[in-house]
């Protein structure tokens, strides 16, 4: 979108080339046709790389390293691969099926995934090296929220957007019949006005 604000067409009194929509169309067309191409991959070099976290940074790094011939394993603490793409962005803004297509593409490139694995608890840094990993890329993301340190923020029913979105997106907590429903009252206050606040609304 940044290039659209500087598009040469604007100087000619025309609308900017809608590059964002064109990219979206191309990606959707490829996905819906089922003909998703796997990029060219360099010859395997036998070097193992561990990636901690399966969010945007971890997945991007994993793809780049796989293309260069590395053996990549992504370790994810949660039970779903995708990090914030799955737990932090609502389905209406980024459908899970789109994220899953990207993850499947990485699998076709040879990337391995380990779910429910907390590096530092389930497996240690030393364990990774003992298992032959020559490098570790930490892409643990922004899993911990920033609180305001005000009275009442630790009351029952008060939660961070991280907790709320994770519970709704991964644990079906918007369903009143779920094990840990989040819908507890008729009046709700959302503190903040950014994208995450709007996602929580």
Range-by-range predicted roles:
Residues 23-201:
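Residues forming the flavin
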Residues 2-28:
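Iron-sulfur (Fe-S) cluster-binding segments and ferredoxin-like electron-carrier domains
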């Amino acid at each position: 979108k940044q290039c659209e604000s500087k598009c040469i067409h604007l100087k000619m009194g025309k609308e900017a080339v809608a590059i964002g929509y064109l990219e979206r169309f191309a990606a959707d067309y490829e996905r819906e046709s089922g003909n998703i191409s796997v990029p060219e991959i360099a010859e395997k070099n036998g070097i193992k790389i561990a990636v901690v976290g399966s969010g945007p940074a971890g997945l991007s790094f994993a793809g780049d390293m796989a293309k260069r011939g590395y053996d990549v394993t992504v370790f994810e603490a949660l039970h779903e691969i995708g990090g914030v793409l799955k737990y932090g962005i609502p389905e209406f803004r980024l459908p899970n099926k789109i994220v899953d297509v990207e993850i499947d593409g990485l699998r076709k490139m040879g990337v391995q995934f380990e779910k429910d694995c907390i590096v530092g608890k389930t497996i240690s840094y030393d364990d990774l090296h003992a298992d032959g990993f020559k490098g570790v890329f930490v892409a643990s993301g922004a899993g911990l929220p920033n609180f305001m340190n005000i009275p009442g923020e630790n009351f029952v029913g008060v939660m961070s957007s991280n907790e709320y979105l994770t519970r709704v997106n991964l644990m079906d907590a918007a369903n009143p019949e779920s094990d840990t429903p989040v819908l507890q009252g008729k009046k709700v206050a959302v503190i903040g006005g950014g994208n995450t606040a709007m996602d929580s609304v």
